[in-house]
Amino acid sequence: MLRLGASVGVHQGSRILFSDFADGGQMWTGNGPREYRLDVTFPEPFTRTPAVTVGLSMWDMDHKTNSRMDIGAENITPQGFQIVFKTWGDTRIARVRADWLAIGSVRDDEDWEIE
């Protein structure tokens, strides 16, 4: 975790979500659910729910169909979140890579608890 000051931390990552053209998966064929979810667990948890952003860093698609997609973060907790990628209609997607960034409060060495 990168620390920005005493009590703010940053986690970041990059993941290939799917590669459906190789095996005729649902995002490529257009059959079945057109949603993919990936659980991300932070290597070190935050002390509170962080702010998380998700973006596309690679999008390989069929040029003969419309380009439609929605990507975001859901179910965010101090321990992790889900990347959610969706498409619809005639869109055919071969593969997608998503990058993410989480910023939030972390435990400081100077923190102490009173019981």
Swiss-Prot record:
Pfam family, one: H_lectin
GO molecular function, one term: polysaccharide binding
InterPro entries reported for this sequence: Galactose-binding_lectin, H-type_lectin_dom_sf, H-type_lectin_domain
Superkingdom of the source species: Bacteria
Single GO BP term: cell-cell adhesion
Gene Ontology CC annotations of this record: cell surface; phagocytic vesicle; protein complex involved in cell adhesion
Protein name: ATP synthase subunits region ORF 7
Organism: Fuscovulum blasticum (Rhodobacter blasticus)
Phylogenetic classification of the source organism: Bacteria, Pseudomonadati, Pseudomonadota, Alphaproteobacteria, Rhodobacterales
